[in-house]
Amino acid sequence: MNVSYMAHVKGKVQGVYFRASSQQVAIEYSLSGYARNLTDGDVEVLMCGEEHNIEKMIKWLEQGPPEAEVENVDVKQVPWQEHHFFAIS
């Protein structure tokens, strides 16, 4: 069953290839959605796809790429959103 989740990632997550790395992992897990920088220095990640793959993506978000220092990941389920790819914005 396809579902959508939104993650708000706090910490040192901008300027460390967090969005690009998120895109690579999302593609690996067959997820669509997006990763975008927020003005407060955090990153927002929308993940759409099979729930077991989203769970894997969330585990990755809790660590991030090597240069990142993730402090917190707040995740909530959101209404299904149809996306055909994983975008960086």
Question: What is each stretch, according to the model?
Answer:
Residues 1-89:
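Intrinsically disordered, low-complexity, mixed-charge
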